């Protein structure tokens, strides 16, 4: 499978951008991490006057066969029910997107029950959910490739419409199990560091989840390469996000990274092209146990720590105002020379 080439950021611009930030009418470093964020935006866009256009969140929804193994506190039909809630405008991501003027797109990547056509729903179905990876690979290599291609296509469509800042959310019962297996196999960390309670498993449910995932990892010990791991354990929504990350970076878009599931999809993308990380803004550290360890793999410093464990792209929407503020101060704050303000004494 061919992936778009991701250009590395131009480090020669770093001192130029840092000088522009330091010349603003404030003590050096006084805006803290907002300054690092502004620097990253400038590097991605190659300018000291970055402009963020048409912020968008794409929510990919799909079902997982491993849900049949009892690894989630909720039944699989909740995936389709939540998609209907998204379309009705009643979910958290709908509320936060409306609040902040973020465009929202809902993609059926492979919900178990086919959904009727509806305004706002994009049909990219690969199949009626994945197979149960406790027994067999979740998808074929061809299905994984088709899902990644579909994710790339959605991003390119938005890029062509002028969007240059994008985030990805997901909905899929049992997708924390898929993410945990992806994380364990691609990082080599102990399964215990990758697994959490998901949507609220009790102790018995967590023990069941641990047993199922350990068995699946042992059964599929031969799956080692990133695309093989994705096809074996992933979900259609995760594969679409992995492709979407690659396409967004290749299009030099600012990428908002949500929670555990999205970061697991990014892990696949990063194993395929490490340059993807340069375009990523990590929006938050979630309550899901594996997320903190996965962020550490990327040496990432997330913007928010709100104990979120919802997914949907909610972290992207909540962090968006910080990006807007970073771009605004870089564009609009006066400089010491322009405002006639004295700099600090040597």
From Swiss-Prot:
One of its GO terms (molecular function) is nicotinate-nucleotide-dimethylbenzimidazole phosphoribosyltransferase activity. The active site is at 312 (proton acceptor). Keywords: Cobalamin biosynthesis, Glycosyltransferase, Transferase. Pathway: Nucleoside biosynthesis; alpha-ribazole biosynthesis; alpha-ribazole from 5,6-dimethylbenzimidazole: step 1/2. The keyword Glycosyltransferase applies. It catalyses: 5,6-dimethylbenzimidazole + nicotinate beta-D-ribonucleotide = alpha-ribazole 5'-phosphate + nicotinate + H(+). HAMAP family: CobT (MF_00230). Catalyzes the synthesis of alpha-ribazole-5'-phosphate from nicotinate mononucleotide (NAMN) and 5,6-dimethylbenzimidazole (DMB). This is Nicotinate-nucleotide--dimethylbenzimidazole phosphoribosyltransferase. The gene is cobT.
């Amino acid at each position: 499978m061919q992936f778009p080439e991701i250009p590395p950021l131009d480090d020669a611009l770093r001192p130029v951008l840092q000088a522009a930030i330091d010349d603003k009418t404030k003590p050096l470093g006084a805006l803290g991490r907002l300054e690092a964020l502004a620097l990253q935006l400038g590097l991605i866009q190659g300018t000291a006057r970055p402009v963020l256009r048409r912020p968008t969140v794409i929510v990919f929804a799909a079902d997982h066969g491993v849900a049949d193994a009892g690894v989630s506190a909720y039944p699989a039909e909740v995936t389709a029910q939540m998609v209907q809630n998204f379309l009705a405008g009643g979910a958290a991501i709908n509320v936060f997107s409306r609040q902040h003027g973020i465009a929202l797109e809902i993609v059926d990547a492979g919900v178990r029950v086919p959904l009727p056509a509806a305004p706002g729903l994009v049909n990219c179905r690969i199949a009626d959910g994945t197979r149960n990876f406790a027994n067999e690979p979740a998808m074929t290599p061809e299905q994984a490739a088709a899902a990644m291609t579909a994710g790339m296509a959605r991003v390119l469509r938005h890029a062509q419409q002028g969007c240059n800042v994008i985030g990805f959310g997901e909905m899929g019962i049992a997708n924390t199990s898929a993410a945990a297996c992806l994380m364990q196999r691609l990082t080599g960390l102990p399964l215990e560091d990758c697994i959490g309670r998901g949507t609220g498993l009790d102790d018995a449910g967590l023990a069941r989840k641990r047993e199922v995932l350990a068995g699946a990892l042992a059964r599929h010990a031969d799956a080692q390469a990133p695309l093989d791991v994705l096809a074996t354990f992933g979900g259609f929504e995760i594969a679409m996000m992995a492709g979407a990350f690659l396409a967004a970076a290749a299009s030099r878009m600012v990428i908002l990274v949500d929670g555990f599931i999205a970061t697991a999809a990014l892990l696949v993308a990063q194993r395929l092209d490490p340059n993807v990380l340069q375009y990523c803004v990590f929006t938050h550290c979630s309550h899901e146990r594996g997320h903190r360890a996965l962020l550490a793999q990327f040496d990432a410093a997330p913007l928010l720590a709100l104990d979120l464990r919802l997914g949907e792209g909610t972290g992207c929407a909540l962090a968006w105002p910080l990006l807007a503020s970073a771009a605004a101060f870089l564009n609009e704050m006066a400089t010491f020379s322009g405002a006639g303000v004295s700099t600090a004494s040597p």
